A protein has these predicted regions:
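Vicinal oxygen chelate
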Residues: 1-9, 31-78, 87-114, 125
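Polyanion-binding surface elements
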Residues: 12
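Amphipathic alpha-helical segments
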Residues: 17-32
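Short, conserved charged micro-motifs
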Residues: 20, 82-87
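Conserved active-site tyrosine of GNAT-family acetyltransferases
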Residues: 21-25, 90, 118
């Protein structure tokens, strides 16, 4: 198929409180803000932008689909060199792990945690 995308440009996560989400992402990921206004904050995460958007603004992007409330409906996985070391660093930053570190039957060593709005992040090697 000609012109098929070669990467994900941005992921938009709908959040209840942009300030709370910003504090979490800056503390946990240590990323500088790429762009911010009253209803959003954008971070450059490798080659992908992570956009934290106030849930109140989400309908404009996805209408006519309904805006979901809460709960894990997807997981974002980030490749890391040392899952155990990063887990120790994350817990030192106040992050509660959902699971792991553990060796998965299909090969990788993983651990997972969620942000204040329930978006699940997995680290894997």
């Amino acid at each position: 198929m000609a012109g098929w995308p070669t990467g994900v440009a941005a992921v938009t996560l709908f959040v209840e409180d942009v300030a709370v989400a910003k504090e979490f992402y800056e503390r946990v990921f240590g990323l500088p803000v790429h762009y911010a206004d009253d209803v959003s904050a954008v971070y450059a995460f490798g080659g992908t932008l992570i956009n934290l958007l106030a849930r109140s603004e989400a309908a404009e992007l996805i209408d006519p689909a309904p805006v979901g409330t809460s709960g894990a409906r997807m997981q974002l996985t980030v490749a890391v060199e040392d899952v155990d070391a990063l887990c120790a660093e994350l817990t030192g930053r106040g992050v509660t792990l959902l699971n792991g570190p553990m060796d998965r039957p299909w090969g990788p060593r993983t651990a997972a945690f969620s942000d204040p709005d329930g978006h699940v992040w997995e680290i894997a090697h």
